[in-house]
Design a protein with these regions (language model features):
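Intrinsic disorder/low-complexity polar-acidic segments
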Residues: 145, 152-326
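Feature for intrinsically disordered/low-complexity regulatory segments and propeptides
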Residues: 2-163, 171
Length: 328
């Protein structure tokens, strides 16, 4: 099963228990490290198209009992990164930050062979300035960030989630941990804030009652998402959760903590303190939306998707799904 192969690029898992989730994050922290090296000293090697090199490394990994790690890499990126004389397999989620560090982009990169792609990376890194901050997790390189704290600030996942839990214990007693999802790119957890439902949603419930709608339909919640590989900041999303089906209704923009400008846990703690006020603000906006009449929901949804420049095919699929949800 994929869930047992933490090293695999497509590894993912879910948790319904907060203690198990935290223990899992502790294991991931123990199996990861951050290292700094001059960007121009980094050298990539392609395994694809080089049978002799592939066989040599497979023998090495077999002797270390980690042949599956290399086999998974060959099925995905087929890249090794040499850092200070040691070769590390490269995970798929690292490609985004690698390209950003090398300052290259373009669809053509997906069409060239791995050998050509590797040469391009090495040429670009050879003229790069400054240091790179590299995360190695579960035997593979997961990210290559800029080495200056202004470029990338490390905010470890474990203390972030622990801080959110402590904050909810203190400020939102009576909450429930619903679920958490982990993969090598991004981690998300969701809590249901039952204990504060009346306080946060009193006006909202009153407006629902005035319109003849059930006040038990939704409860407040929090979704927290973070990433160590450049996919997301440490972002707090106030949400509503439908009571019957558990669907999530986003409430405006998240409270974002970007991994830049020397951001630290103290800064994130300050962001947590904004959560109650953000709930109030977004609920007020939600109430105002109740006065907006939508006569043609299908066309309205298509218009919204066009506004955000969603692909046409995906837009029609989303609009059809939306139509089925509202039972028109």
């Amino acid at each position: 099963m994929t869930e047992t192969k933490v090293y695999a690029d497509d590894f993912r898992c879910s948790f319904g228990d907060s203690d198990q989730f935290i223990e899992f994050l502790k294991e991931r922290k123990a199996q990861s490290t951050w290292m700094t090296a001059p960007s121009k000293s980094l050298q990539f090697r392609a395994l694809a198209g080089n049978e002799n090199l592939s066989n040599l490394y497979m023998q090495i990994y077999q002797s270390n009992g980690k042949a599956e790690v290399l086999a998974d890499t060959m099925e995905n990126t087929s890249l090794l990164l040499n850092i200070k004389g040691t070769d590390y397999p490269v995970r798929s989620c690292a490609l985004k930050t690698i390209l950003e560090r090398a300052r290259i982009s373009g669809n053509a990169l997906n069409k060239v062979s791995r050998e050509v792609f590797t040469r391009i990376l090495n040429y670009c890194l050879d003229v790069a300035s400054g240091d790179s901050l590299i995360k190695v997790a579960d035997d593979k390189v997961s990210a290559v960030h800029g080495g200056d704290p202004k470029d990338y600030a490390v905010l470890e996942m474990l203390p972030l989630f622990q801080m959110v839990g402590s904050f909810l214990d203190r400020e939102f007693p009576g909450y429930q941990f619903l679920t958490a999802n982990y993969d090598h790119s991004i981690v998300t957890a969701i809590w249901q804030l039952d204990g504060q439902a009346n306080d946060l949603l009193d006006t909202y419930h009153q407006e629902l009652a005035n319109r003849g709608l059930s006040t038990d339909a939704v409860v407040p919640g929090l979704r927290f998402t973070t990433s160590d590989v450049g996919m997301s900041g440490a972002n707090l999303y106030p949400i509503l959760i439908t009571a019957k089906r558990g669907r999530i209704i986003p409430l405006g923009d998240p409270i974002k903590t970007e991994h830049t400008n020397s951001a630290d846990l103290m800064h994130f703690e300050g962001q947590l303190a904004l959560l109650y006020a953000r709930f109030r603000e977004t609920i007020e906006k939600q109430i105002k939306l109740m006065d907006v009449e939508i006569r043609y929901p299908y066309n309205t949804m298509l218009g919204v998707l066009k506004r955000i420049k969603a692909p046409k095919k995906a837009s029609f699929e989303a609009a059809d799904q939306f139509l089925s949800l509202i039972h028109i």
